[in-house]
């Protein structure tokens, strides 16, 4: 904000000398208002700055250490992931895939679980809607509304079965 105002004032300086004088006053007030807070926090950030530097250095060392540790298991994980059998993966490196596998279904699980609830909610809504629709059209068009109701009720059931199977498979995988 300050740099943009400064640039705008610089552009307007040759146009009017009075505006330049006003800009000097603004600079003076800005320098005073900015200088007093700058001077007061400066001693306090000095100590955290060194702490932050040390902390960042520790983090970098820790990250390098982690990366160096994880390079071999990551390659092993990728190679084991290339092989389709998870049992070999468990036997090769028992420590790593166990945290890896629950995290995968845990991230995958919330997506299948809300969808069956949505499918069941849609199925119940369709069933209630079909019940409401069935009573009036039974007199007018009996064959069409039951066909619609059967199709609409069968589709969410299929989706729900697929989703439940996938979630069960994920649970079995975990």
Swiss-Prot record:
Give GO cellular component annotations, separated by semicolons. nucleus
Segments carrying the region annotation (Disordered) are 1-174
Does the record carry Nucleus as a key word? yes
The residue ranges flagged as biased composition, category Polar residues, are: 47-57, 84-95
- List, as start-end ranges, the regions of compositional bias called Low complexity: 27-36, 58-72, 116-125
Q: Where is the signal peptide?
A: none
The places in or outside the cell where this protein is found are: Nucleus
In which residue ranges is the amino acid composition biased (Basic and acidic residues)? Answer: 155-174
Task: Tell me which UniProt keywords the record has, alphabetically.
Answer: Developmental protein, DNA-binding, Gap protein, Metal-binding, Nucleus, Repeat, Zinc, Zinc-finger
GO BP, one annotated term: segmentation
One Gene Ontology term of the molecular function aspect? zinc ion binding
By sequence similarity, the record places it as follows: Belongs to the hunchback C2H2-type zinc-finger protein family.
Role summary: Gap class segmentation protein that controls development of head structures.
Its protein name is: Protein hunchback
The organism is: Drosophila mulleri (Fruit fly)
* Gene that encodes it: hb
């Amino acid at each position: 904000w300050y740099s943009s105002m400064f640039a705008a004032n610089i552009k307007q300086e040759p146009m009017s000398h009075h505006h330049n004088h006003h800009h000097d006053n603004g600079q003076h007030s800005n320098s005073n208002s900015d200088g007093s807070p700058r001077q007061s926090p400066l001693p306090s950030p000095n100590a955290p700055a060194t702490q932050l530097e040390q902390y960042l250095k520790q983090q970098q060392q820790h990250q390098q250490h982690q990366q160096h540790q994880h390079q071999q298991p990551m390659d092993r994980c990728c190679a084991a992931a290339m092989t389709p059998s998870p049992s070999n993966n468990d036997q090769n490196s028992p420590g790593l895939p166990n945290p890896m596998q629950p995290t995968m279904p845990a991230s995958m699980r919330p997506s299948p679980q809300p969808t069956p609830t949505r499918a069941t909610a849609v199925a119940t809504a369709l069933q209630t809607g079909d019940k409401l629709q069935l009573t009036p059209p039974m007199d007018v068009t009996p064959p069409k509304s039951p066909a619609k109701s059967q199709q609409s009720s069968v589709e969410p059931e299929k989706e729900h079965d697929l989703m439940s199977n996938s979630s069960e498979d994920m649970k079995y995988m975990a």
